[in-house]
Each structure stands twice: as structure tokens, then as C-alpha cells.
Amino acid sequence: MSQAFRTLALLGKANNDDVNQTINALYKFLREQNYNVLTETRLAHQLPCPAEHCMDIVELGKNADLAIVVGGDGHMLGAARVLARYDVPVIGVNRGNLGFLTDLSPHDFEVSLQQVLSGDYQTEHRFLLETTIYRHGEPKSSNTALNEAVLHPGKIAHMIEYSVYIDDSFVFSQRADGMIVSTPTGSTAYALSAGGPILMPQLDVMTLVPMFPHTLSCRPIVIDAHRQVKLVISPDNPDEQLHVSCDGHVTLSVHPGDEIIIRRAPHQLTLLHPKDYDYFNVLRTKLGWSNQLF
């Protein structure tokens, strides 16, 4: 048996009827089991929760043994980027679309969740990416991503000219609509849509997936996750703002001549799954792969 939990954090998208229904059911279930339940402040109005048990996500990270996130992968990504800094394990209840990161069904979560809370679960560690923008050699902005960091144009799609370095080794220069640098977790997200490979979550690698490159010879590259990726933006690009998006949530501004450093973050996400979790079953279900023929 693994660690059991007593103080639980409930997180979810506020003002969403489906999410609200599930959060209320979770809160009732957990309190009936005598768990200590903390919630996000923005959810406090819909739960009979004491004021001292309602707090922001940073305080939840400092006080909870386990976080239960209700929503889709997008909400899970937002919570994970913060909670990973506090080494708080996370499990998800799916109220989104695909739900690669949210295992529990909102309709019958009780048995699986009780097993997890009792210490009967699988543990998986997912690393994050740390992205920093340098301008004239000085750091200007930074953020983290669980799925991917994406270099892309602003409001109007156009080609970007940039060079790629792995550590200090020049790899190639390219004109493309952008570049996706993905973790294994993100290999079933944006990188998959751009033609990148599906990577098992346990692999310690990053994937570089160019977006619509203006060449026939360009292919995705898989590299050791302990390497550093540097994207150098050509000063010959049009003098307009480019962006790096972290998980599609946080946007960092990039100018011609800037350098983008992407490396493995110092912290990681601890993701919990029910005991019967199977990664390839998830892929088959979410991606609509055919069933076994014989």
C-alpha cells in the first residue's frame, strides 16, 4: 500500500454547471468519509465550507496532502503548474473533452477514489519545462509548462525565421510557422496534431516539432530531457511581436533577435492513477484506435 491521505484540496472551474455538480458530490462524499477538505476561494460560495478552509491555489499547495482537480486537461494543466512546486500529488475527475490527465469519471468516482485515498493507486512523475526569454542577454520573462512551449506568430499567421541549438551545438535554421517543444505528457496534445510522435510518459525526453516548415526534409527530433534547447529568433523577422505559449495558458512576448531557452524544470508533477490504470487503454479510448482483432 502507498501513502494514504487525510487533507484534500478540491479545485475546479468556477461557474460551470457540470463542474459545480461534481464538486458538490465530491465534497459531500469526502466529508461523509471524515476527510479534511480544503477548497479554492472561488468555489467557496457553492460549498458549505468553513472560511478557514477556503484559500488560493498556492495556500492549497502548502496545506494539502492531495489535490483533486475537476475539469478537463486544460484545468489540470493550470493546477499542475502551481501544485508541482509544492510536491502535492494530483488526481483528476474528467469534466472536459479528451481527458488524458483526468482518470476518474464524474458519474461513478466513489469506488476508485476511495481506493486511491486508502493508498491503493499508481504513481507517475511528469516533468515540466521551464521557458525563459532573453533580450540583449538579459532574462525578460519566464514560465513553466507541463505539455509544451510553443513559438508562434501573433494575431496573423506568417513564417518565422529561427535557429535551433541543443546545448551549444547548432542543429538547423528554419523558416516555419513556429516550433513546439513538448514533454512526453504533451506528446498527445498540440505536438500530436503537428505530426509529432506519441511518447510514453515515463520517457525522459523532449520532442521538437516544427510547425508547417518551408522544407521537405524537416522531421520531429527527440532529445534527452536534460539537454537545453535554444531558439534564436532572426533579427530579420518582421518587426512585430511573436509569442511563446506555455500550455496554451501563459503567453510570453518575443521580439526579433531574442533567445528562447527551454529546459527541464527543477520540479515535477506527481500524478496519481487508479490501480487499474493502463496507458495504452487510455490511448485506444481517447484516440479511437481499433479494437484487438484476434
Swiss-Prot record:
The keyword Nucleotide-binding applies. It is found in: Cytoplasm. GO terms for molecular function: ATP binding; metal ion binding; NAD binding; NAD+ kinase activity. The keyword Zinc does not apply. GO terms for biological process: NAD metabolic process; NADP biosynthetic process. Its EC number is 2.7.1.23. Keywords: ATP-binding, Cytoplasm, Kinase, NAD, NADP, Nucleotide-binding, Transferase. One of its GO terms (cellular component) is cytoplasm. NAD(+) binds at residues 73-74, 147-148, 158, 175, 177, 188-193. The active site is at 73 (proton acceptor). Its cofactor is a divalent metal cation. It catalyses: NAD(+) + ATP = ADP + NADP(+) + H(+). Its main location: cytoplasm. It comes from the Bacteria. Belongs to the NAD kinase family. NCBIfam families: PRK01231.1, PRK03378.1. Involved in the regulation of the intracellular balance of NAD and NADP, and is a key enzyme in the biosynthesis of NADP. Catalyzes specifically the phosphorylation on 2'-hydroxyl of the adenosine moiety of NAD to yield NADP. This is NAD kinase. The lineage of its organism: Bacteria, Pseudomonadati, Pseudomonadota, Gammaproteobacteria, Aeromonadales.
